[in-house]
Structures are given as structure tokens and as C-alpha cells.
């Protein structure tokens, strides 16, 4: 497994779509899509044909890493690359009257070496035509690109694409596909946050992680006035090929993507990740080890949420551990899962550059029976906010063998809140700190004599008021140590209850402590289940250092 940076240029990219490889699978015919930039040969296209293409490709050797780019593109700095802009006058659907959506393309360059092919599809005739690269589609501004090196290189392709929605048809994008199989979307804040991927392979194994690539896209021409469009994608890597269909709904307050993928394994795969997502968690209320900045919290997502196949709701706050952690939460036909950013209060972040309070949540809703497997979560240590250190995906229980065909259907919701939530009481926040003393009586003369770690979990909603306070019973399970000084406190400002306990070690072990808690009333669960992983300090660190200077 490699530590990853979001959309990093070193991701393995596979060359799959030679001109003959794609065009030979579709017959030529006439073309009438509303695009004035599509200039390639006219070919017939449909999703069934794309599936056949991916299946045939899986029987051939992988094409390997992409070739080098012209020097003027390969040596671009991030600042220079970002200064290259697509010319909105050449947008994909500029010929569609009353269009609500439009497409622009990303330039290849810097770390984006994959030459991705783009096609415009006429939805009436099912005819497609390629859009070839040419310098006049872009504004190079101060990038310092020597465009004479690019003349006649129509096979350069593009790095990716982004989607714009009226009334911001050329100013603020709402969907972006860029780098390997990464893609993102926004809610009504127009603030990007976490990312999704087409597929994850061997994320946490003893081998090298593999990053499949989307190597070609086909865009159904959007209808006038429509805020939904369909794009198809061909995925390729050393281990697998895939045919993807995305039906993308660009709604007022959220983006919803219906995803259908058909996967064809080239070789045995140790770990396959379905509906993977990548996020960042540096510090928060529960984890402040590296929070030595002016910002109280720094994260794209604050929790993993799961709606299990048996109906149980899970809240698992994210961590920034000192050592890489991988956890697999077993399930059978999950109802949904996602990485959520539910804390939307600016004062909790104080960030006017990255606006973490505006970042969207991402919820996965399976649209078919996924069977047995696990929601897998990997957390990587990070010192700041530039590393995407959280990865989550569904891992099927059944081993993937060469020649296998798999189909997964799911829906992605990019929104401030997930589309569903538990009817029970929900975890609002998790806080940790010094323990070993009665709440409200932290001693001022000296630190507590015995070391302990305090946990405070805030619950809101559900039937808490009907049960509270005497009938609320916290059910706490620990993999090691003891929970003492358990308290149930009503918190008027958020009209909920805080469950507080101190964790005391019973051994010198520094192994992670798995914690589990839910609230019960008269034998029935009245809250979702809180899961947490705590990392005890070494025995010689289990003391409080008094650094006061008394004169």
C-alpha cells in the first residue's frame, strides 16, 4: 500500500484505448449530436457494446503505463497547470439551446499523464464521435506552455472533465472527474471535499496498491432544460477492466449519481474495493494530537456511518492514528454507508481558506443485493491537511479470480446530510480528554493521582426525551480496560444527552481498544451504535506532567 495524495500524478495509469481498439467495435454511420468540437470518425455506441469492449479487453495483456508527455507539459508546476483554462466558448454542449448543463475538459500535464479519450453521443441515433485534443480549445494564460510542441498531437487526449450547471455555466463546476478513476461532486455550497473512485484494488495488502484508470468517456448529449445527464466510462488496470454507466442528477441542493458497473477480472485480486471513497481527517473534537494550528478542527469528514443489513445504525468517528489502521466491519447486504461531514458550524473550524464547514457528505446506497462482505476503513497517519488519509469501500467476501465477471449497482449522494438517517437517537459529537476526576472538579492544585481517559458522547433526537433521564441505560463494551464514572448528563444548548465515562487501563498493552456503546431503555435500543478505536499511550506516558513554574 502506498501513501496517497489526492489525484497524485504517480498513480499507475494504463493505456487501453488505441484508436483501433475502440473504433473497431462499433460500425460507422451518420452523426448529429449538438457539439461543434467533436471531430472524429462516426461510430455506433451503446452500453452493451461498451461491456463487450471491456470484456474483450480483459482477455488481452494490460497496456502498461502511459508514454511520456511533451516536455512543455510534463514539467509544469502545479501553479502553471492550474493556470491553463478550458475555453468556455468550446464547451461540449454550447450548441444545445436552453441548456442547463455543460462540459469542459482538463488539459493533460504535470502528473496527469493519462491520455483520456472523450466522445460525444447522439442519444437519438446512438452514434458517437470523438473529440480530439487541439490547443485552440484551451487558454494557456501564464502557464508558459510552448504550444508549438502540441500542434498536430490530436492523440494527446484530455486528463478529465468537469460539469457546470446554470446559472453558473462557465464559472463554478459541480462535478469533476480527474486523475485515475477519481471523481467528486458538490452540494449547494459549491465546495468540493472528499472524493470517490471507480474501483480500489489491494488498498491494504502485502503488495502494491493498484489505481485503475478511466481511459475513455462517452457523453450522451444533454436535453434542453434537463439537469440530468448520462456518461459512460471504460476502466482499465493490470488486474481488471470495467464498463461504467453514470446517470448524474445535478439537483438544487445535491448531486446524485446512479452507478452501474460491469467488471471483468484479468487476474486474481486479493482485495477489491467497491464504491471506494477517499477523505481527510487531521484533527477534531475526539482527536487533537496534531491540532497545533489556529483551527479547532481540520477534516473533510468526521465519521463513517453505516446502515447494516440487519437494520443496525452505526456511527464510527474518524481518527488520525499514529500508526496505520485498517478495520473491516462485516455485513450481509448492507443498506448503506458513507463518510459524513455533519458538523457544519464555521466556528468549529475557523477556516476561511478551505471552508471545511461547507464540505459535502457522501452516502452509498446499494441498488442490488451485494451479499456478504465488509465495509472496510483505512486510516493513515498525517501531520496536516494535504494528505487524503482516510479510505472506505465495500469489500466482497468472495475471492475474485481471473475471468470473473461482477456487476454492482449503487447510488451516490453528495449532500450536506445523508438521504436517510436513523429514527433512533443519533451521535452528534465525540469528545475525549483528561479523566480521573469528578466532572466539574478538575483539580487546580495538582493533576489527578490516577491516569484515565475521559470520553463524552453527545446524543440527540429519537425518543431520548421520553426515556430520559432515569430510563436511559448506556451499554458499553470494551475490548480491554474498564469503564468507570459513567454519567448521563442533559445538555440544554443542543437539547440532548451526554454519556460520559472514564477509561482505565487494566494492562500495559498499547493495542487499540475497540469501544462500543448504545443506549437502551427497558431492554430496547433507543440509539444508534457508537463505535470507537482508542490508542492507549505507553505505560511510561500514562501520567500528567505538571509544567507549572511556581515562584
Swiss-Prot record:
The keyword Hydrolase does not apply. The keyword Signal applies. GO terms for molecular function: carbohydrate binding; catalytic activity. Its main location: periplasm. It is found in: Periplasm. It holds the Pfam family MdoG. One of its GO terms (cellular component) is outer membrane-bounded periplasmic space. Keywords: Periplasm, Signal. Pathway: Glycan metabolism; osmoregulated periplasmic glucan (OPG) biosynthesis. Residues 1-32 form the signal peptide. Predicted to be exported by the Tat system. The position of the signal peptide cleavage has not been experimentally proven. It comes from the Bacteria. GO terms for biological process: beta-glucan biosynthetic process. InterPro entries: Gal_mutarotase_sf_dom, GH-type_carb-bd, Glucan_biosyn_MdoD, Glucan_biosyn_MdoG/MdoD, Glucan_biosyn_MdoG_C, Ig-like_fold, Ig_E-set, TAT_signal. Probably involved in the control of the structural glucose backbone of osmoregulated periplasmic glucans (OPGs). Belongs to the OpgD/OpgG family. This is Glucans biosynthesis protein D. It comes from Salmonella paratyphi A (strain AKU_12601).
Amino acid at each position: 500500500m502506498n501513501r496517497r495524495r489526492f489525484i497524485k500524478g504517480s498513480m499507475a495509469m494504463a493505456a487501453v484505448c488505441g484508436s483501433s481498439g475502440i473504433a473497431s467495435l462499433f460500425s460507422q454511420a451518420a452523426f448529429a449530436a449538438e457539439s461543434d468540437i467533436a471531430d472524429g470518425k462516426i461510430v455506433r455506441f451503446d452500453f452493451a457494446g461498451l461491456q463487450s469492449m471491456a470484456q474483450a479487453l480483459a482477455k488481452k495483456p494490460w497496456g502498461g503505463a502511459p508514454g511520456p508527455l511533451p516536455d512543455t507539459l510534463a514539467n509544469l508546476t502545479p501553479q502553471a497547470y492550474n493556470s491553463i483554462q478550458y475555453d468556455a466558448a468550446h464547451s461540449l454542449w454550447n450548441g444545445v439551446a436552453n441548456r442547463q448543463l455543460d462540459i469542459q475538459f482538463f488539459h493533460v500535464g504535470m502528473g496527469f499523464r493519462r491520455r483520456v479519450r472523450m466522445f460525444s453521443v447522439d442519444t437519438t441515433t446512438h452514434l458517437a464521435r470523438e473529440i480530439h485534443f487541439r490547443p485552440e480549445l484551451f487558454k494557456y494564460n501564464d502557464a508558459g506552455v510552448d504550444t508549438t510542441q502540441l500542434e498536430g498531437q490530436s492523440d494527446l487526449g484530455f486528463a478529465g472533465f468537469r460539469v457546470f450547471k446554470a446559472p453558473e455555466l462557465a464559472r463554478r463546476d459541480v462535478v469533476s472527474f480527474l486523475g485515475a478513476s477519481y471523481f467528486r461532486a458538490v452540494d449547494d455550497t459549491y465546495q468540493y471535499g472528499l472524493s470517490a473512485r471507480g474501483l480500489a484494488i489491494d488498498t491494504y495488502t502485502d503488495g502494491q496498491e493498484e489505481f485503475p484508470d478511466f481511459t475513455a468517456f462517452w457523453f450522451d448529449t444533454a436535453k434542453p432544460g434537463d439537469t440530468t445527464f448520462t456518461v459512460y466510462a471504460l476502466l482499465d488496470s493490470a488486474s481488471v477492466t470495467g464498463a461504467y454507466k453514470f446517470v448524474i442528477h445535478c439537483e438544487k441542493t445535491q448531486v446524485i449519481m446512479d452507478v452501474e458497473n460491469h467488471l471483468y477480472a484479468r487476474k486474481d485480486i486479493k482485495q477489491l474495493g467497491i464504491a471506494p471513497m477517499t477523505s481527510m481527517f487531521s484533527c477534531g473534537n475526539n482527536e487533537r494530537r496534531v491540532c497545533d494550528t489556529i483551527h479547532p478542527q481540520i477534516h473533510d469528514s468526521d465519521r463513517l456511518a453505516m446502515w447494516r443489513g440487519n437494520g443496525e445504525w452505526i456511527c464510527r468517528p474518524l481518527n488520525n492514528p499514529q500508526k496505520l489502521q485498517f478495520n473491516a466491519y462485516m455485513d450481509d447486504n448492507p443498506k448503506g454507508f458513507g463518510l459524513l461531514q455533519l458538523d457544519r458550524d464555521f466556528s468549529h473550524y475557523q477556516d476561511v481558506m478551505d471552508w471545511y464547514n461547507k464540505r459535502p457528505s457522501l452516502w452509498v446506497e446499494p441498488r442490488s443485493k451485494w451479499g456478504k462482505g465488509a465495509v472496510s476503513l483505512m486510516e493513515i497517519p498525517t501531520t496536516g491537511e494535504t494528505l487524503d488519509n482516510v479510505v472506505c469501500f465495500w469489500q466482497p467476501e468472495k475471492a475474485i479470480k481471473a475471468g470473473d465477471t461482477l456487476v454492482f449497482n449503487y447510488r451516490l449522494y453528495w449532500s450536506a446530510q445523508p438521504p436517510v438517517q436513523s429514527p433512533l437517537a443519533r451521535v452528534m459529537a465525540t469528545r475525549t480528554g483528561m479523566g480521573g476526576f469528578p466532572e466539574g472538579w478538575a483539580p487546580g492544585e495538582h493533576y489527578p493521582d490516577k491516569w484515565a481517559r475521559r470520553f463524552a458522547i453527545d446524543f440527540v433526537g429519537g425518543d431520548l426525551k421520553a426515556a430520559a433521564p432515569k430510563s436511559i441505560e448506556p451499554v458499553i463494551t470494551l475490548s480491554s480496560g474498564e469503564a468507570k464514572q459513567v454519567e448521563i448528563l442533559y445538555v440544554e444548548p443542543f437539547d440532548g444527552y451526554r454519556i460520559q465515562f472514564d477509561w482505565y487501563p487494566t494492562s500495559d498493552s498499547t493495542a487499540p481498544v475497540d469501544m462500543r456503546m448504545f443506549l437502551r431503555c427497558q431492554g430496547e435500543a433507543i440509539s444508534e451504535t457508537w463505535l470507537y478505536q482508542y490508542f492507549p499511550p505507553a505505560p511510561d506516558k500514562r501520567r500528567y506532567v505538571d509544567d507549572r513554574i511556581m515562584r
